[in-house]
UniProtKB/Swiss-Prot annotation:
<dbReference type="GO" id="GO:0019288">
    <property type="term" value="P:isopentenyl diphosphate biosynthetic process, methylerythritol 4-phosphate pathway"/>
</dbReference>
<feature type="active site">
    <location>
        <position position="136"/>
    </location>
</feature>
<comment type="similarity">
    <text>Belongs to the GHMP kinase family. IspE subfamily.</text>
</comment>
<dbReference type="Pfam" id="PF08544">
    <property type="entry name" value="GHMP_kinases_C"/>
</dbReference>
<comment type="pathway">
    <text>Isoprenoid biosynthesis; isopentenyl diphosphate biosynthesis via DXP pathway; isopentenyl diphosphate from 1-deoxy-D-xylulose 5-phosphate: step 3/6.</text>
</comment>
<dbReference type="InterPro" id="IPR006204">
    <property type="entry name" value="GHMP_kinase_N_dom"/>
</dbReference>
<dbReference type="Pfam" id="PF00288">
    <property type="entry name" value="GHMP_kinases_N"/>
</dbReference>
<comment type="function">
    <text>Catalyzes the phosphorylation of the position 2 hydroxy group of 4-diphosphocytidyl-2C-methyl-D-erythritol.</text>
</comment>
<dbReference type="InterPro" id="IPR020568">
    <property type="entry name" value="Ribosomal_Su5_D2-typ_SF"/>
</dbReference>
<dbReference type="InterPro" id="IPR036554">
    <property type="entry name" value="GHMP_kinase_C_sf"/>
</dbReference>
<keyword id="KW-0547">Nucleotide-binding</keyword>
<keyword id="KW-0418">Kinase</keyword>
<dbReference type="GO" id="GO:0050515">
    <property type="term" value="F:4-(cytidine 5'-diphospho)-2-C-methyl-D-erythritol kinase activity"/>
</dbReference>
<dbReference type="InterPro" id="IPR013750">
    <property type="entry name" value="GHMP_kinase_C_dom"/>
</dbReference>
<keyword id="KW-0808">Transferase</keyword>
<dbReference type="InterPro" id="IPR004424">
    <property type="entry name" value="IspE"/>
</dbReference>
<keyword id="KW-0414">Isoprene biosynthesis</keyword>
Amino acid sequence: MKQSVKAPAKINLSLDVLHKRPDGYHEVDMIMTTVDLADRIDLTLREDGLISVDVSEGFVPNDEKNLAYQAAALLKARYHVNEGVSIYITKRIPVAAGLAGGSSDAAATLRGLNDLWQLGLSLDELAVLGAEIGSDVSFCVYGGTARATGRGEIIERIASPPPCWVILAKPPIGVSTADVYKRLNVSAIDHPTTEHMIAAIEGKDFDGICHHLHNVLESVTLDLYPEVRNIKEQMKRFGADGVLMSGSGPTVFGLVSKESRVQRIYNGLRGFCHQVYAVRIIGSAGS
């Protein structure tokens, strides 16, 4: 038996970091939404009880370090599943980009194996399991649009933003999330009012959403990596309505309301950035 599952990327419309917790994680308050740039997870049952992972992208681990492998191993051990699974990941989401590609692969594996192994778990139960794998996995189990608090595992699903285009641009650099958080001084930065973003989303106020885009991690990443700052500036110059870095970077996204501007922005960015994508916000979960 086989199962194919999409694993969409996410962007942060708002990302606030409140403080470092005693357990070493940071307390966050984020608004995330999924876009229609997605990896594909192909799951094939195997009778020998083993788990294997193959990936189309050479830079992604294909062993126990892979989050999809960890998701399968967790489900198999927790629910005493005898069967194994072969996992093939077709990567479309850029790697180490701030778009939760690995977390989304893990979440898609949880959802797909829940069906394939006939476990009958709810999304809420899968999200709790996802939190054991990584902070973004719980959100990715649901997809759609949500507020994430705690270390990212407490999910409150909210309405979807109005339909719009999203331009994604990833410079050819890697960003250490741990280093960004280590350098972040939460007492010396401006913090977003997350409720304002929620109100704009629920009111389908595109201009309000663009106005309230805020990511406190930009205060670190833009100084460490001038390439990210340059992409933000160029995206604004080419005509994006709202521009923000996603996660800890280095990917920058631009929200665009008019399709007539999308190609111009895309072409302009492709002049100096190889990984550029024109996608749409998916909308509600399950779309």
